[in-house]
Amino acid sequence: MSKISSWTCLWSAVACLSALHPSIGNSKDYGKPGEPVHLVIGYQPYYTQAWSAVIQKEMKPWEKYLPKGSTVAWEIGLQGAIVGNAMLADKNDIGYMGDMPTIVAISKRDVRELRMVAVLGLANDQCSVFLSRNEAPDFKSPEEAVKWWSDKRVAVAKGSCTDRSGQETMRKFDIKPAQYLNQNIEVQTSNFKAGRLDGSITWEPTASKMVMEGIAKRIGDTKMIGKLDGGFMAMQHELIKQRPDVVKGWLEAELDANLFWAKPENYMKVVEMAHRNTQGFSKEVLWMSMAGKYPKVMGGGDVRNIMYYGFDRDVENMIRDAAAFLHVIKVLPMAELPQDLVDASWTNEILKQRGLKVPLAKIEAQDPSKYPEGKINLPATWRE
């Protein structure tokens, strides 16, 4: 059992639940088109790339599009696999997740039929930020800094985007860590503090929290390997079949949320919404995770997130690469996802009706001096 990641076990538990309780696959009655509907949304305020859900929750653009009298309940998932499990157990109707948990969830059609229906974004440093302990040497580039990980203790959440990024980085640069550990973000944080960890890969906003609070230092992201990670929205297939009006309405509202977020003058408003939905994260940290510009030597770039909403060749290639990785590590039984599990028809139609194309926009990185609410205190590890 020790060789099996806890992330994989989490998914296995759902499969076992399905076997013991065949009723898990029963169809829910979502009502007839035009009738009020009640939706339960699984969302991740602790994953910056998925904050369009926070905008939906706080601003309620969905009220404009769903049938009058409809209601929405929100359930926080501390990681994507929790949201995916809730969807497989028919507890969430719509889920906002990172690439790996979305792909795994929709692949389990023997448990429940789910579909990927929209893209939250693609980025180099939303899901995979590379960190080293503060005492690590300062190097001239992210590539040199990550090579220091050879013979060191490195942690990722195995089976996640951080694992894929980690394994590809180690292959590319011939890095052989002394230990390649499976640790969630809480354990990584405590182990950096205790001096029991040399490097890790984690997602935003936890990455910025660790950097800005002086727990670890930022050394890079997936630009080193030329890869992008992504976030996606999944829906229950029964919802799609029974209530096309609700599916279209929710995705219309999702596009509104994306277009609001894409405007720099709204960045701080989005941060304030995220702040109301999280605990233990300052607004400065949340802003840095979403729009803060880190120096190049720390792996920073000019763009923090590419807002797609719909699907294109880049998104398809990212999904294909992620599925292939999950197959190699024996999480997926297939090397490629069946095409019908990704339903791009809804976003394609809405984008066409509005005269828009993907990608919609980019969240441009801003110098910390641009933070709207005063000076940000930069950590001692900050290097220009």
Task: List where the protein language model places each region.
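Short, low-complexity disordered leader/linker segments with a strong preference
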Residues: 1-38, 360-384
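Short, glycine-/small- and polar/acidic-enriched structural segments
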Residues: 28-184, 191, 198-204, 227, ...
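Short polybasic/polar patches that bind polyanions
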Residues: 63, 68, 171, 211, ...
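Short coil/loop linkers at secondary-structure junctions
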Residues: 68-69, 112, 171, 176, ...
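Short linear loop/turn motifs
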Residues: 72-73, 288-296, 337-349
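Pocket-lining segment of extracytoplasmic ligand-binding domains
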Residues: 179-181, 186-284
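Secondary-structure end/capping motifs
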Residues: 243-336
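Conserved C-terminal helix/tail region of periplasmic/extracytoplasmic solute-binding proteins
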Residues: 320-384
